[in-house]
Amino acid sequence: MTLAEEFRSRNFSIYGQWTGVLCIILCIALGIANIFSFAVLRIIFSVLCLISGLILIFIEVPFLLRICPTSSKFDAFIRRFTTNWMRAAMYGVMSVVQWLSLLPGSGASSLIVAAVFLLIASIFYALAGLKSQEFVGSKTLGGQGLVQMIV
């Protein structure tokens, strides 16, 4: 299945996964950009954003669990997020954490962009769950086709 065919499938988990890839890029970039601040709360939220981005890499690009040396506890933690509902909940929690970066001690920052895109990914996964669509991983990002080629 090509990338265009994946998007035409109208499976919201595909949309959620590709929005998740965008969230990875945004969380890492904005986490690094906002860490150079004098506001202690903003530094804390930027570190949390950076950690979120690093966790999302392993959740959204599954073949990385096979090629990167990780502990069995970390692998078990990542494998919890295989359903649409669990991913929607995870993205929702990460979004709420970034929305909390608007607290008065931190002030408004570009971390809001990460919060918005994390919320969009959460909505896509929740819609997939509501429509009872099975989670389908993109083959481009390491779905079944790529994983079988590596093994």
From Swiss-Prot:
Family designation: Belongs to the TVP18 family.
Gene Ontology biological process terms from the UniProt entry: vesicle-mediated transport
TM annotation in the entry: 21-41, 43-63, 88-108, 110-130
Name under which the protein is recorded: Golgi apparatus membrane protein tvp18
Cellular localization per UniProt: Golgi apparatus membrane
Isomerase listed as a keyword: no
InterPro entries for the chain: TVP18/Ca-channel_flower
UniProt function note: Golgi membrane protein involved in vesicular trafficking.
An annotated GO cellular component: Golgi membrane
Cysteine disulfide partners in this protein: none
Topology with respect to the bilayer: Multi-pass membrane protein
Keywords per UniProt: Glycoprotein, Golgi apparatus, Membrane, Transmembrane, Transmembrane helix
Sites carrying sugar chains: 11
